[in-house]
Structures are given as C-alpha cells and as structure tokens.
C-alpha cells in the first residue's frame, strides 16, 4: 500500500487539456466508481453529498458548464471558459441536505481525495474545478432538484494533448487556446 501511494503521490498531476479524439474506457471507469462507492465511509452513514456523473449525452448542459466555470488567469482576469470541463466525464459533487451540514464540505473533500487516488492509480487523468459561476443553477440542472448547490467538479479522462500543442479543438465550434501552466504535467497516454 505504501509504495503504491508514494508512487501515485509523486506522479500526481492536474490535467487541463483532455484529448477527446481518443477512446475513453467507460467500463474501467465504472469499475473504479463501483469500488469507490462501495468503500467510501460517511459520518453516521449519512453521505451529505450527491455525486452525478456526466458524459457528453447532454451537450447543452456540458456547454453551459464549460462557459459557467471561469477560472482566473495569473494576471487576475477571468477566462471565458474552462478547458478542464471538456474532459470525457465530469464527476459533480453537490450537497444534498438543506441546510447544508457542517460536515458536508469535509466529506466531499475526503471523497474527492479517495476518488482521485483510485482514478489516477488506475490510469485515469483528473483535474479539479471549483470556480463555478452560478453553483445553484448548475447544481439544480445537474441533479434535477431545486435548491441544490454544485460544490466541485472532478474532470476525468485518459488522454491529454502533448505539451506544446498550441490550441485544442472545441466541441462547440469556437476556437480556444490551450491553457498554459508551468506546474501542469499533461502527459499523453
């Protein structure tokens, strides 16, 4: 266990530019999700969060998430979109009790850590997106329930564009520039 954790920890990365032209192994992803969901603990077995997994079946929702998650760049300007959300799959965490219990954000953090570790140790690339412009509206659209707040998105893929790729295709038709980040370690698989 220690060697596996140390190896994964030392090779951790955040992927911003997922390559959608290569196949995504949905069966392997589902196996990781099954393993995660059957082993994740919760305080008093309440699970104060809900997890929704989005593929590309609802392109309009994915486009709204793409334009509704706008990170800041180093110069303190808002970007118009978030490349991370173009991943093959988005794992969306929302709280599911009203009012939100104090423990919800802690449990979401623990679940994110566990899921990220499982995914990366099984060959998946991940990222992290919490810069959500209207978390209430997106949360309600994702879950189909009113008064739901989207807390965090975990983009998941298996392939990234190689370093030095000047731009990536936008599935919505507009050209986008590749996000550059010195700490980014996008690696093609």
Language model segments and positions:
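N-terminal amphipathic, basic helical "cap/leader" segment at the start of enzyme domains
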Residues: 1-89, 186-189
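Small-aliphatic-rich amphipathic alpha-helix that forms the alpha element of a beta-alpha
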Residues: 32, 36-37, 91, 96-141
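Generic beta-strand structural signal
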Residues: 87-89, 122, 148-152
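C-terminal helix-cap and adjacent tail motif
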Residues: 4-15, 20, 24, 149-189
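Short, hinge-like loop/turn segments at secondary-structure boundaries
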Residues: 68-70, 144-147
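Short, charged/polar surface micro-motifs in flexible loops or helix N-caps
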Residues: 56-61, 97-99, 160
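Short proline/glycine-enriched turn/loop segments at secondary-structure junctions
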Residues: 139-146, 167
